[in-house]
Amino acid sequence: RRDAPLHLMRIRPDFDEFAALAADHTVVPVWAEVLADLTTPVAAFARVVGDNEGFLLESVDNGDRWSRWSFIGRRPQGTLVSKDGRLQVIGDLGIDIDPEEGMLTALERLLAHYRSPELDDLPPLHGGLIGYLGYDVVREVEHLPNVPADDLGHPDAVISMIGELAVYDHWRQRVTLLANVVINDDTDLQAAYDTAVAQIHQLADDGARAIDEPLMSLPDPSDPIPEVTST
């Protein structure tokens, strides 16, 4: 169905399923799948992320051929930055971080706390942590002398919790639009779910309007069967 209104996208899970998942998990994805067979990952990245922070990951076969998946991420739930031996938290990572505890210790606690459902309909990457650990992070576990001069001024490490994703399945010519929700003890589930749904619609709108290339919603079993004529 071409040019279907964005509000007709099938959002998954529904709220009742979302609330049930939130009872046992600390991060719950909300997503919708639409058709998108007229795009390239680089063009989609330019539209969806633009000049803001984001990432593009490609799956590759044998090191030299593009494969099935492209992952475009933006607006992380939270980011952990290590600089000069101190940690800074931007956003909501779901746990309290001590600025002095070190990146490796913080990551160990984050991974122990992170629980997201494994659902068959989700793409292989739909959440988790992404970023980099610089060489000097090793100084948290090894006492190395002669700290080199910091001539770049970059953080020693930056790790983000994936927030919004557009996952392109080139084999099926579909894109999964996804927003992750961090679940805390005081999370208003209805408000969090509604926010995630709004993020998905915004993600679709940002990806569709920059060029004349429609996102098409998937057919539904309740759709009327069109009449067929022959000549």
Predicted segment positions?
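Extended accessory regions or peripheral subdomains of proteins
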Residues: 8-54, 59-99, 135-231
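Short acidic (Asp/Glu) patches
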Residues: 103-120, 142-153
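Catalytic beta-strand/loop module used to bind and position nucleotide/cofactor moieties
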Residues: 128
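Short, Lys/Arg-enriched N-terminal segments with co-localized hydrophobic residues
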Residues: 1-8
